Amino acid sequence: MIRIGTRGSLLATTQAGTVRDALIAAGHDAELVIVSTEGDQRADAPIAEIGVGVFTAALREAIADGLVDAAVHSYKDLPTAPDPRFMIAATPVREDARDALVARDGLVLGELPAGSVIGTSSPRRAAQLRALGLGLEIRPLRGNLDTRLNRVSSGELDAIVVARAGLARIGRLDAVTEALEPVQMLPAPAQGALAVECRAGDTALAQVLSQLDDADTRAAITAERTLLAELEAGCSAPVGAIAEVVESIDEDGRVFEELSLRGCVATLDGSDVIRATGIGTPDRARELGLSVAEELFELGARDLLDEGGRDR
């Protein structure tokens, strides 16, 4: 029996459930084990205040202590600094990485009047919303997805911005009034992706879990998180990134794969946003992340991050 550790929220158990079901379909016995994390216990505190790894540390300790065999994380919650005790055995196919607007009266972002109150506790989302210059008021937002959605339906907020992937996984895409394109708002690095982690030395389990791995997703996540790590920015920093594997055709008509990466760094107040893009190949995803990070540095990203503080 493969014991899979997960947080207890509906979203977390649904995500982990997809991994459990895939393992069962492949002929392996698997079950979910609920693990309480500090992020769940301190649901009202801003994530940036609690610290890096707030949703993942307890799951990792459960693996280390032998309480579970593996854990399923929202990949974007994992600290960028590697922990030698563990390995990412699988990165399953990624959900749509875009952010989603859930607004009153079916409104899209451009239709919200100046002064509208939008909920988000993500510095990245808040900074990019402010940078659009729409005169929106940003309010802190924590709690599970149902709680967040209710703050719009109750009239407390005019809109919220959340990850589209989360709403898709719990079957609430009906609430989305607009999927925000990356040109409007770059997602968090690794948004919409899952990380299936196990003990570094558990090669037999890692081999089983690797059946769930998607090479294109792994390449994209590697590029995005390399950029994030190189910027020395934590998962709460105002940094956005999205990488995609795309097919191109060379001059001889042959199809080949490229990896594109877009990244941005913003000031917390949205007064300045620096953007950079790059093209590479999936097998050199890390190098692409490094090169786009270097371009961001050349454009002044270091000063912007120093202004907002860094946290690995």
Swiss-Prot record:
GO CC, alphabetical: cytoplasm
Record-linked Gene3D superfamilies: Periplasmic binding protein-like II (3.40.190.10), Porphobilinogen deaminase, C-terminal domain (3.30.160.40)
Residues modified as S-(dipyrrolylmethanemethyl)cysteine: 235
Gene Ontology MF term list: hydroxymethylbilane synthase activity
Pathway in which the depicted protein is active: Porphyrin-containing compound metabolism; protoporphyrin-IX biosynthesis; coproporphyrinogen-III from 5-aminolevulinate: step 2/4
Keywords: Porphyrin biosynthesis, Transferase
Signal peptide: none
EC number per UniProt: 2.5.1.61
Reactions it catalyzes: 4 porphobilinogen + H2O = hydroxymethylbilane + 4 NH4(+)
GO BP term, pick one: protoporphyrinogen IX biosynthetic process
Cofactor annotation: dipyrromethane
Classification via SUPFAM superfamilies: Periplasmic binding protein-like II (SSF53850), Porphobilinogen deaminase (hydroxymethylbilane synthase), C-terminal domain (SSF54782)
InterPro entries: HemC, Porphobilin_deaminase_cofac_BS, Porphobilin_deaminase_N, Porphobilinogen_deaminase_C, Porphobilinogen_deaminase_C_sf
Cofactor note: Binds 1 dipyrromethane group covalently.
NCBIfam families (alphabetical): hemC
Other comments on record: The porphobilinogen subunits are added to the dipyrromethane group.
Subunit: Monomer.
Similarity comment: family membership: Belongs to the HMBS family.
Described function: Tetrapolymerization of the monopyrrole PBG into the hydroxymethylbilane pre-uroporphyrinogen in several discrete steps.
PANTHER family: PORPHOBILINOGEN DEAMINASE
Name of the molecule in the record: Porphobilinogen deaminase
Species this protein is from: Mycolicibacterium vanbaalenii (strain DSM 7251 / JCM 13017 / BCRC 16820 / KCTC 9966 / NRRL B-24157 / PYR-1) (Mycobacterium vanbaalenii)
Gene: hemC
